[in-house]
Amino acid sequence: MAGQKIRIRLKSYDHEVIDVSARKIVETVTRAGATVVGPVPLPTEKNVYCVIRSPHKYKDSREHFEMRTHKRLIDIIDPTPKAVDSLMRLDLPADVNIEIKL
């Protein structure tokens, strides 16, 4: 797979879980003999939702909730077949969304 690059994007609501997953990916791929760039922290997406506290009246009383989406980017340059195989076998938490582009 000479001259190829694999780009992995991780998304999660918990920054600790995404950092552990990124560290696991980097360790696995470097052990298999490929070069890794990253993990690069991408900007955190923050969604704020405004909700009226009362079900019927008192519109001035509102409550704000926010959801933060943390993102990381990992590039694998010149991946070996062993690195790709070990990457496919890697067990990661369910709350981490993984996008892989070749």
From Swiss-Prot:
GO terms for molecular function: structural constituent of ribosome; tRNA binding. GO terms for biological process: translation. Keywords: Ribonucleoprotein, Ribosomal protein. HAMAP family: Ribosomal_uS10. Involved in the binding of tRNA to the ribosomes. Belongs to the universal ribosomal protein uS10 family. This is Small ribosomal subunit protein uS10. The lineage of its organism: Bacteria, Bacillati, Actinomycetota, Actinomycetes, Micrococcales. The gene is rpsJ.
